[in-house]
Amino acid sequence: MYKQDFPEGKEALNLEIRLGNKLVRFRKFTGKEKIYLPIQRHTDKVIKLIDKDSPPLEGDAVITNLKNVEIGVRTADCVPIILLGKEWVGAVHAGWRGLKKGIIAKTLKALKEEGEDDITALVFPSAKGCCYEVGKEFKEFFRRNLKERNGKLFFDPQREAVEQLRENGIKSILVWEKCTICSPELPSYRRDKTKERMLTSVVILF
């Protein structure tokens, strides 16, 4: 399942999607939000949050079944992914290193170990193949989603993330096909070397 009729322009910077008792948000990160955010290091570590008072840990994905506890990840070109199960939810920061290390598969495995076998994935804007120039070494890391143009190599991490979701049995996937690099309203480290980030988060409501 795909959905691409997401808002454009400034409206895209304050998006909320309610799915049942779950609320997903995509907005500019201010640093004042009361949200559980992992210490992101481009790893394949998945944090299972079972205590709302737990301090931030190093990792690039979080899963939880706690009610009214918002979890999220920060991105500015990497792929932000929200995973929705019946009782558990997850937030994933998938840069090219995380995609190479299998962060998506490991997060899905953690959710399935908690009994989640019907998961919906929401994939939000990231750098895409139109703009994301990479080195030739990427041919060693990824066998697909690479294109050469004018002697340069480009990689599409969002498409790679979607294909990894499919390979791990996820059939319900909503994709916001937007490139952060060529969308000036969205923060892009590659374009601006900015410290700004987008915050993609999810909360299970009572």
From Swiss-Prot:
Keyword check for Oxidoreductase: yes
EC number of the protein: 2.4.2.1, 3.5.4.4, 2.4.2.28
Annotated positions binding Zn(2+): 42, 78, 93
Reactions mediated catalytically: adenosine + phosphate = alpha-D-ribose 1-phosphate + adenine; S-methyl-5'-thioadenosine + phosphate = 5-(methylsulfanyl)-alpha-D-ribose 1-phosphate + adenine; inosine + phosphate = alpha-D-ribose 1-phosphate + hypoxanthine; adenosine + H2O + H(+) = inosine + NH4(+)
Alphabetical list of CDD domains matching this protein: YfiH
Gene3D superfamilies named in the record: CNF1/YfiH-like putative cysteine hydrolases
An annotated Gene Ontology molecular function: oxidoreductase activity
Cofactor(s) the record lists: Cu(2+); Zn(2+)
Short name of one Pfam family: Cu-oxidase_4
The entry's keywords: Copper, Hydrolase, Metal-binding, Oxidoreductase, Transferase, Zinc
Iron as UniProt keyword: no
Subunit and partners: Homodimer.
Family: Belongs to the purine nucleoside phosphorylase YfiH/LACC1 family.
NCBIfam families: peptidoglycan editing factor PgeF
Protein function: Purine nucleoside enzyme that catalyzes the phosphorolysis of adenosine and inosine nucleosides, yielding D-ribose 1-phosphate and the respective free bases, adenine and hypoxanthine. Also catalyzes the phosphorolysis of S-methyl-5'-thioadenosine into adenine and S-methyl-5-thio-alpha-D-ribose 1-phosphate. Also has adenosine deaminase activity.
Protein name according to UniProt: Purine nucleoside phosphorylase aq_167
